[in-house]
């Protein structure tokens, strides 16, 4: 299973992986719902999500719930990513969200089903040793979750393919 995704931007020195992961999951779900692929604003979450801490981290589930509650969300070009904490702007945006629910998968099988039918989901991983990763299959056995990414596919060997927010020079 593979999902189409918008181009990922690097989160830079701002700990906003949670915002990228949440926004990318919503973008993917919107695409599965029949909308064209859109590039939604991560910065709106960094600045405005009351359940997270901006560049100091956050939670994908509360971020998606916050987006759903807003009903309309700005595009990246309407509320651009700055890689730093900012004041919450009242920019409402021009994209009406059709996503209206958030699921937390209870198993790998459930996660696979979500990927295949509802879009590329937001997932948390232990990225403690990812700074030295260059390519290939990486085994992640820890339950110390400290980084948000997006599951975008499963390869022929059953390995998850993830989309990271560290830019094109990583991996």
List each language-model region with its residue ranges:
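Catalytic-core signature of thiol
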Residues: 1-171
């Amino acid at each position: 299973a593979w999902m189409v995704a918008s181009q990922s931007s690097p989160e830079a020195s701002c700990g906003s992986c949670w915002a990228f992961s949440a926004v990318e999951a919503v973008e993917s779900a919107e695409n599965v719902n029949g909308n064209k692929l859109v590039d939604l604003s991560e910065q709106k979450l960094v600045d405005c999500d009351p359940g997270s801490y901006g560049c100091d981290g956050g939670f994908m589930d509360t971020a998606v719930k916050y987006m759903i509650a807003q009903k309309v969300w700005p595009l990246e070009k309407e509320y651009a990513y700055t890689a730093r904490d900012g004041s919450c702007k009242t920019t409402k945006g021009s994209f009406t969200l059709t996503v209206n629910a958030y699921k937390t998968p209870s198993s790998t099988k459930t996660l696979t089903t979500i990927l295949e039918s509802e879009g590329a989901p937001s997932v948390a991983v232990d990225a403690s040793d990812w700074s030295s990763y260059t390519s290939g299959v990486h085994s992640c056995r820890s339950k110390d979750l400290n980084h948000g990414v997006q599951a975008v596919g499963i390869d022929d060997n059953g390995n998850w393919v993830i989309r990271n927010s560290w830019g094109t020079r990583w991996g």
